[in-house]
Amino acid sequence: MRREFPQKGVTNLIEGVKVKELKVIPDERGRLMEMLRADDDLFMRFGQIYMTTAYPGVIKGWHYHKKQTDNFVVVKGMMKVVLYDERESSSTRGEVNEFFMGVHNPILLQIPPRVHHGF
């Protein structure tokens, strides 16, 4: 599923990074957005779900996980998520990806183990 994602600044996805465009269904009651299903190509297995917030002007990063794959979705507002690949065995070592995601660009961003990320 590796492909170029049509977003400004992202010309070559970091190896193992996947992007799923999310469909938002609004109506008079609010919005519905399905994020991840067990039959999605991106679904691996269930581990945990957590929610984080960031105050305006605050940056959370740089960090990575040795074994964990992250699935990021921004449900309110907009966030810039930056990825950096320093994995020695990766074909995209040294590559940086930037994603602007949230209510105006609803995507799920899958980040593989050992890829640095911050937002």
Question: What do the predicted segments below correspond to?
Answer:
Residues M1-N105:
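Non-catalytic, conserved peripheral segments adjacent to functional cores
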